[in-house]
Amino acid sequence: EQQKYLNARKYIELVIVADNVMVKKYTSNSTAIRTRIYSCVNTLNLIYSAFNTHIALTGVEIWSNGDKINVQSNSSVTLDFFGTWRETVLLNRKRHDNAQLLTAIDLDGPTVGLAYVGSMCNPKGSTGLIQDHNKLDVMVAITMAHELGHNLGMNHDGNQCNCGGNPCIMSATLDFEPVYQFSDCSRDQHWRYLIDNRPPCILNIPLRTDIVSPPVCGNYFVEVGEECDCGLPANCQNQCCNAATCKLIPGAQCEDGECCERCQFKGAGTECRAARSECDIAESCTGQSPECPTDDFQRNGQPCLNNQGYCYNGNCPILDHQCHNLFGAGATVAPNACFDFNRKGQGNSYCRKQNGVTIPCARKDIKCGRLFCVQGPIGNTISCQSTSSQDDPDIGMVDLGTKCGDGRVCNSNRECVDVTTPY
């Protein structure tokens, strides 16, 4: 399962914002700004093909009438403002995975870019700041690839890191020559980040109609006007696609996909995604498409694991399993006496937070707040174990949809309600 996730093609739906100083630098020529951005994205795709990741430019915003945040040379402050703007404004206007601010302001000191580390899909953190620091498109694109690398869990390369004797993308200092390779350290950090965090937003395939950059035959992504795209002719390894035209060969129905075999659609009814659990449903090919249908699951609220839980979005969340995940296989759910701490609303024991204030659980809701576990057999003394994280307030809390009583489950407000009501 882990290897399957790592091998799956990833897609980053990217929005690039050009600030008002960019507008002035290019004398209000929005076409020139867009052309530069398109060129940068083409280079990004060349670089990130090493990770089987496609960068889909789904939005370009040019602040022609003035900046929408306070853009200043202090890179940390500007990135903070931009992240907040993305979270509160841009995401409400347009769904996307990552946003980069391209500025013509001279950032502080030698800085030409800044980004949060390991933050892909985070509403504020999936952002970067790029200075338009070089006449060459490719040099700005490499800086963007570097900052995007931070978002994807990569740190700066140390002396022990290498990518074949040349400076690498994640080098701490900018080289004067274009570099296109990630180091062995970057690869390890990126895979570890994906395994540990599984950022959820980078698996869906963007709609062709959402992409704003001109179609490029040879970038491994099927865009408007193309039937297939297997890369440049010298690199194409797909017998179903004409790499020079990005059209299917005569007689071919498809290029690839879970329901495509030898250039033809698999027959209707061919299983393409097995059921992961009793709460999941197996999917089968339609005979009319190369793609496996959208992942579906049993109805929410259906009893599962011998009535220990109720199905929720394809899983069967129960307290014991959540204890195993947090504290290891020997951990089990704690007695009710531990969960009574949630009624106090002190420390990390509560049901929810409102405006930074912890709200204690009502008696009926104690098993929907902080999760408490115990290790090994329970003797005369009970040691209630729990965990929490400042970075992610949901870590250590009981999962949504968990059974909290007969015919009752935890809803999104951390209340224990009738199983027929929260869905």
Curated annotation (Swiss-Prot):
Keywords associated with the record: Apoptosis, Calcium, Cell adhesion impairing toxin, Disulfide bond, Fibrinogenolytic toxin, Glycoprotein, Hemorrhagic toxin, Hemostasis impairing toxin, Hydrolase, Metal-binding, Metalloprotease, Protease, Secreted, Toxin, Zinc
Sites carrying sugar chains: 29, 74
PROSITE patterns: ADAM_MEPRO, DISINTEGRIN_1, DISINTEGRIN_2, ZINC_PROTEASE
Pfam families the UniProt entry points to: ADAM_CR (PF08516), Disintegrin (PF00200), Reprolysin (PF01421)
One Gene Ontology cellular component annotation held by this UniProt entry: plasma membrane
Gene3D superfamilies on file: Collagenase (Catalytic Domain), Disintegrin domain
Compartments it resides in: Secreted
GO biological process, any: proteolysis
Cofactor(s) this protein cannot do without: Zn(2+)
Primary residence: secreted
Tissue spec. comment: Expressed by the venom gland.
Domain Disintegrin: 214-300
Disulfide-linked positions: 121-201, 161-185, 163-168, 217-246, 228-241, 230-236, 240-263, 254-260, 259-285, 272-292, 279-311, 304-316, 323-373, 338-384, 351-361, 368-410, 404-416
Signal peptide: none
Single GO molecular function: metalloendopeptidase activity
The enzyme's E.C. designation: 3.4.24.-
Enzyme class, spelled out: hydrolase
Subunit structure: Monomer.
Name of the protein in question: Zinc metalloproteinase-disintegrin-like batroxstatin-1
Organism: Bothrops atrox (Barba amarilla)
